[in-house]
Amino acid sequence: IIGEALKRLHKFMGYDTIGDIHLGDWGLQMGLIIAELQVRQPELCYFDPNYTGEYPKEAPFTLSELEEIYPTASLKKKEDPEFAEKAHIATFELQQGRAGYRAIWNHIMRISLADLHRIYDALDVHYEAWLGESDADPYIPAMIEDLKAKGHAVMSEGALVFPVAEEGDKKEIPPCILIKSDGAAIYATTDLATIVQRMQDHDPDKMLYVTDKRQNLHFEQVFRAAHKSGIVKAETELEHVGHGTMNGKDGKPFKTREGGVMRLERLIAEMTDFVRAKVVENQIVAESA
């Protein structure tokens, strides 16, 4: 909603604006779902490396099941190092093109996108581009080679990193990790590749990133890397618009009674019911006064 408001304001001021949802569809969250699904249904053809037939058109899970699988897997990752390792391997193999995992990914995306379209339409939020991390993936190899050739990408403790610290920094700015020691690309890698893609497709004067303010350091690293490497022009503006979180009584991001993150749809429904009850209550008070 904040991004939609900023887009409309810039459009009113004369900018040609493009809203991009930038789906997080290529990272560890996908590996977690794949790993948890394999625990629950190991007999599925997606997990047979020797399978050569067509994969089912129908997903082996529903939206409600998918919404339960991910938080379960996310919690298990913190408690079970062996499961966490399997999720990392699944993420890497998905990114490398393993057919069965790509088929699961297609199921996840089809179900998730249908739900997202429905929710955003209800909020009157509209994106001109429905791209994600997966769309930036083809740009990564050439980008990495270019960063190596220019001396920006260096090896450190088995990982490929881009040092972005500057003299005068008042706080430590760690290197931007490009490729982890296990060979997997991460959030920063795809964010940089997305900037490459956007510069080639649109050459924008300004890019606004509207996310949780807890990602401030991440975007500081990515934006510095983009400018230092020449991925963007010196005059191209990169800005992180960090917003707060809705917190519970403990001061931490609000969760449901079950301990998971509340879905936006459920939050809107609860807020609507609360306001409706208050309106009725105020009407009763006014009529009895």
Walk through the language-model features, giving the residues of each.
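NTP-dependent nucleotidyl-transfer catalytic core
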Residues: I1-A289
